[in-house]
Amino acid sequence: MPPREEMIAVGETKVQVVIGGQGDPLVVLHGAGGNRGWRRWMAAVAERYTVYAPTHPGFGRSDAADWMESIDDLARFYLWFLDVMGLSKVHLLGHSIGGWTAAELATMRPGAIDRLVLVSPTGLKPDEGEIRDIFFYPPEELLQYTVHDPATVPEWAELFGQKPGPAEIEIALRNREMTARLTWKPYMFNPRLPHFLPRVPNPTLIVWGREDQIVPVICGEQYRRLLPNATLRVLERCGHLPPIEQPDVFANLVLDFLGRA
């Protein structure tokens, strides 16, 4: 079944959601770059699961949410989203700030989800090094730190090969502004999260790129230690975007992990 787009009202906030596939529900929470649409890895996973990919409030074409001030708020919003959609015991996957959101949600209501996939998540202060300040760089330069080797990215031309037009620039600025609103002070982590992660009993797959220059791979080790039932997979020759950089490998990891449910 081809994917479709819907605008879903969660309270007074309407969010854009891409839905496709068949089978048990998998909710996908995007990172700071915004919802990149129906990607190659999603199409592979959607052969066995129904994928729900919402665009966060304040991002893309979703409504603004000026009341929202933290990733905690975003996690609570997505608990409400699950209720509105009538979804229970979903598999939950999040990338970068979406991974942080997924982790926070899991600490709030672990019974709402079945299996958890965290992909290069922010949310923890690195024991060594630091999370790169993504607001310091112009988009073109930031992309150099985000992807390890553009030549190996199958969808590079489609995603990044064209100079953005006015509409794309406006969305990028909107995404950037909302990311700053949600993740600033302290930058990209919640000092309370480490104390709540041990509450999450759900089987968890953590995926990281060995060459991630945005969030140090040591954060993956920290998540693995704090989550009682977690496995960490580190992909070689991969940066901060495993689903985009190695879509087939990533899709197979996800399918194998979810298939154990």
Label every model-predicted segment.
Residues 211-215:
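Acidic catalytic loop of the alpha/beta-hydrolase fold
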Residues 11-61:
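Conserved HGGG/HGGXW glycine-rich cap/lid loop of the alpha/beta-hydrolase fold
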Residues 200, 206-208:
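Short beta-strand/loop motif that positions the catalytic acidic residue
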Residues 94, 98, 102:
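Gly/Ala-rich beta-loop-alpha elbow adjacent to hydrolase catalytic centers
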Residues 52-94, 252:
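Active-site loop/oxyanion-hole signature of alpha/beta-hydrolase fold enzymes
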Residues 230-261:
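Catalytic active-site module of serine/aspartate enzymes centered on a nucleophile-bearing elbow/loop
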Residues 166-195, 199:
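Hydrophobic, aromatic-rich cap/lid helix
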Residues 103-108, 113-145:
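Flexible "cap/lid" loop of the alpha/beta hydrolase fold
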